């Protein structure tokens, strides 16, 4: 449980650090950070394209850190024998809302790409780079409990995967396999299923209703519900953005040559929702209908 009222200053990880010389530009490594944006053309839109994706990658990085904390806290709460369903979840619910806010950052940042007018100026120059290759997003999805739906997502009409996918597999295939093994029984979807199994009731709706009235389970499910909606919105927006951008350049494949229609649509067809019954239950209870 967070003890914000009793925290004490921590010493620097580097005991030789002279904190009097730790200025804003050095602490945030601004020069190194800004040097990471390196457009390949003189297009006035390419620097924006890079910046938006780098902002999202920074958000993903922090989301991964906080998701690890959420999963650890949930695992400990599940193992707490003081409650037959789940113990104190305040630690998990301290970090979970931060993940949700960061996901909102991603969802409000990506639409800026719609302001580009000259995607065609640099699209071919950036080569096989593709959002498909975001290993951090894959890491986050695996921690969420998503299966390997993206496998083969770039295959052409002959069934051959694009270089964007083959190179991604070569570079990060072993990491992906390790993440699937590590989070097999340690992910959001797994803990959701565990809570359902422990909850009284003969139907999923009855089980969810009981959990939403449980003092420790309820805030977790509310965070999960929001996370699921954000995940679905991200995939829906990504698909819509890809369609819009490719209309500008008059082609049918995404950056890197990926078959975006099949790949981006697979999540909704094969994975969503992450927490079956949760969003629908909320809609039914509130009488709002599913608006996602």
Regions found by a protein language model. Give the residues of each.
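Surface-exposed peri-terminal alpha-helical interaction modules
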Residues: 2-283
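Short, C-terminally biased terminal segments at protein or domain edges
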Residues: 283-292
């Amino acid at each position: 449980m967070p003890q914000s009222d009793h925290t004490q200053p921590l010493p620097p990880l580097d005991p030789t650090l002279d904190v009097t010389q730790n200025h804003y530009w050095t602490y945030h490594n601004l020069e190194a950070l800004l040097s990471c944006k390196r457009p390949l053309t003189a297009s006035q839109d390419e620097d924006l394209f890079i910046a938006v994706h780098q902002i999202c990658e920074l958000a993903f990085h922090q989301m991964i850190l906080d998701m690890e904390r959420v999963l650890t806290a949930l695992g400990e709460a599940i193992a707490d024998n003081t409650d037959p369903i789940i113990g104190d979840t305040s630690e998990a619910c301290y970090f979970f809302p931060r993940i949700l806010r960061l996901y909102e950052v991603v969802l409000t940042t990506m639409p800026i790409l719609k302001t580009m007018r000259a995607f065609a100026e640099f699209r071919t120059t950036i080569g096989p780079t593709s959002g498909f290759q975001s290993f951090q997003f894959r890491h986050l999805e695996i921690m969420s409990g998503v299966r390997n739906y993206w496998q083969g997502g770039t295959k052409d009409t002959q069934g051959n995967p694009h270089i964007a996918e083959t190179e991604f597999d070569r570079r990060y295939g072993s990491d992906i396999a390790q993440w699937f093994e590590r989070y097999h029984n340690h992910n959001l979807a797994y803990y959701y299923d565990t809570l359902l199994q422990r909850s009284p009731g003969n139907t999923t709706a009855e089980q969810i209703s009981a959990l939403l009235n449980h003092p420790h389970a309820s805030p977790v499910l509310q965070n999960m519900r929001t996370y699921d909606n954000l995940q679905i919105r991200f995939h829906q927006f990504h698909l819509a953005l890809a369609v819009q951008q490719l209309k500008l350049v008059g082609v049918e494949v995404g950056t890197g040559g990926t078959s975006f229609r099949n790949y981006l649509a697979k999540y909704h067809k094969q994975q969503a929702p992450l927490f079956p019954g949760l969003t629908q239950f909320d809609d039914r209870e509130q009488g709002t209908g599913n608006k996602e």
